[in-house]
Each structure stands twice: as structure tokens, then as C-alpha cells.
Amino acid sequence: MSGDVVAELKGRIDKSLEGLRTDLTRVRTGRASIAILEGVRVDYYGTPTPLSGVASVNAPEPRLITIKPWEKSVLKDIEKALREANLGINPMNDGEMIRLPFPPLTEERRKDIAKQVKTKGEEFKVTIRNLRRDANEVLKTQLKDKKITEDDHKRITEVVQKQTDAGITQVDEIVKKKEKEVMEV
């Protein structure tokens, strides 16, 4: 019964870490990354459609993304969606495809982005600590209901703490790696 608490905690921490990684792929660095466009939806015949569903998206150069729609009639809608997405990048439409040139980030902008990354990491640390609190509450309830012994409670609480520490360490590593990527010129 109590092993389930640890397994569930580990699963939820892993999901949180995956969520952090996903969120950070959308953070703009000095390089062109097609992941930044994942949240962009294009009005395709009245239906909000992911950009990848209406066009081919490529990063042929480190500071350029090209978007070639499968239907030329969608070009204006794609351009509109990109402008509304507030990516901080000005789309250039040449009638055939859209180019997204990524200008080099200024030192000040890189520091702002690094600060956002750090804030996002702190949010995920709080999430992991809340998961620990939930697991500990389940264990207390099990102890109170005599489903586990005092010794089991103490032992499992230590395992829960180790899982939490490991999760927070991973958050720190992910954030540090992303900050380094952002600060690279």
C-alpha cells in the first residue's frame, strides 16, 4: 500500500520534470528552434490548427526558421497567427514561404530570459514540494488508520524526501543547462 505512495510520487515528479522541459523548449534562445512554434495555432478554414498541420517548418540555419505552407492560400493566415503569437520575431512573407529571422539577443534580453527560466524552475520546485506534502499526508492517514507501522512511516517518509530531493536536483540541472544555453552568444 505505502509502496504505491512512493511509486505515485515518482511518477508525478517525472511528469513535472517533463512539463518543465516542455515549457523551457518554448523559451527563446539565441538559436532558431522550431519548438518555439509549438503553441502557434493557425485559423485554417475556421478551425484553429497547429502550425505543423498546415505547413512544413524547418530550421535551415542557426538563426532562421522557414515555414512553407502546403496551400498558398494559408500563407496570410500563418503570418497573422505568427504576429498574434507575440514571439518577438517579425515574420517575412515572400509569397512562397515565411521566414522567421532570429536576431542575436542583446545581453540585457538574455539576462531577462535567464531570469524567466530561473522563475519557471522555482515554480516547478514548489510543485515538487507540494507533491511531497501530499504524499506525506497520505502516509499520515495510513499511519492513523493503522495501515502502516511507525517504523514503516518513518522509513517511507525518508524515501519520499529522497525522491523530492532528487526531483529538485534535476530541476536545478535542467534550469542551469537552459540558462547556459540562453547566455551563450
Curated annotation (Swiss-Prot):
It comes from the Bacteria. Keywords: Cytoplasm, Protein biosynthesis. Pfam families: RRF. GO terms for cellular component: cytosol. The keyword Cytoplasm applies. The keyword Phosphoprotein does not apply. CDD domains: RRF. Belongs to the RRF family. Responsible for the release of ribosomes from messenger RNA at the termination of protein biosynthesis. May increase the efficiency of translation by recycling ribosomes from one round of translation to another. This is Ribosome-recycling factor. It comes from Myxococcus xanthus (strain DK1622). The lineage of its organism: Bacteria, Pseudomonadati, Myxococcota, Myxococcia, Myxococcales.
